[in-house]
């Protein structure tokens, strides 16, 4: 133990000597180095921030309402390229009771660049959401509904709860001091840095071309989501008004020949757009002419006509 401490002290002394030499020989490089370390340290310590919240349902093992908070966190590594896996971090499920409502909340974090890129591309945004849902299913052995919608609020629950969940913050100061006293060694500080993206679960966003070196599971994900060319179905979109010609709702009728069940349809609605997908058959994405109330949106499937009707009240 004593020799280990001496060895560590020697390494620290050598490191400071190198910094002193650098400061004397090349002050500009020394300044850049210090600024870079401060920047990386700040990013490493930065807390996750809520980006958007999804509502869906857990079907198995027990049916429950589920909210997924998608957060941006600089501590999560960014993917090396468009064909590399996308790292993400998933917090533990938390069951929350509010009066008569009981629901589950799961926090998911991506690197900020990943979410910002998805905000500009609805297709990538949907892929990112569905990959997060798939990762949740695999990690917790859940079966989730294929349908989801983006809520009006960015986070379900408090920001403090989300930070504690993702960052593992201990709220008891005495426990935190004891943990630091027992575990805060230089080696553990080094190992806790997030320079290695293997520490996080990773998924691949589908691209037209995927590297042959990608893992088998990732190749399967890509092949099922991008290599099948889906048709754009015929549809009718109209705004329904009242007797005074005041717009009330948007009604969308979509013809889906060959589809005989609503369970085959994936429907995603936000205030400004709608996405309808039928696996390996149809895909329809539309920007809506008016903002709609996602919580009051309804959908029904007329089996005889193979037609999906979505009714979206205006905000």
Swiss-Prot record:
This is PIH1 domain-containing protein 2. It comes from Bos taurus. Belongs to the PIH1 family. The gene is PIH1D2. It comes from the Eukaryota. It holds the Pfam family PIH1. One of its GO terms (cellular component) is cytoplasm. One of its GO terms (biological process) is box C/D snoRNP assembly.
């Amino acid at each position: 133990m004593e020799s280990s401490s001496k060895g560590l002290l020697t390494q620290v002394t050598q490191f400071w000597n190198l910094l002193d030499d650098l400061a004397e020989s090349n002050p500009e490089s020394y300044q850049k180095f210090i600024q870079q370390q401060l920047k990386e340290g700040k990013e490493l310590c930065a807390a996750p921030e809520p980006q958007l919240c999804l509502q869906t349902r857990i079907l198995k093992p027990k049916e429950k309402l589920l909210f997924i908070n998608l957060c941006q966190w600089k501590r999560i590594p960014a993917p090396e390229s468009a064909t590399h896996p996308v790292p993400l971090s998933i917090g533990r499920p938390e069951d929350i009771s509010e009066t008569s409502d009981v629901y589950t909340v799961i926090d998911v974090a991506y690197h900020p660049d990943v979410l910002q890129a998805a905000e500009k591309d609805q297709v990538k945004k949907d892929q990112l959401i569905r990959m997060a849902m798939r990762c949740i299913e695999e990690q917790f052995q859940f079966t989730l509904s294929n349908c989801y919608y983006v809520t009006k609020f960015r986070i379900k629950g408090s920001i403090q709860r989300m930070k504690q969940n993702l960052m593992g913050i201990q709220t008891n100061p005495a426990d935190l001091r004891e943990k630091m006293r027992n575990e805060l060694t230089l080696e553990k500080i080094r190992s806790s840095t997030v320079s290695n993206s293997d520490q996080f679960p990773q998924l691949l966003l589908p691209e037209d071309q995927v590297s042959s070196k990608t893992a088998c599971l990732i190749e399967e994900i890509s092949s099922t989501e991008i290599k099948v060319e889906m048709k754009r179905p015929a549809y009718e979109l109209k705004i329904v008004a009242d007797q005074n010609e005041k717009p009330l709702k948007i009604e969308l009728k979509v013809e889906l020949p060959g589809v005989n069940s609503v369970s085959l349809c994936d429907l995603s609605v936000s205030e400004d757009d709608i996405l309808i997908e039928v696996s390996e058959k149809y895909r329809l994405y539309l920007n809506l002419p008016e903002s709609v109330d996602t919580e009051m949106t309804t959908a029904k499937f007329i089996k005889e006509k193979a037609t999906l009707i979505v009714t979206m009240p205006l905000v």
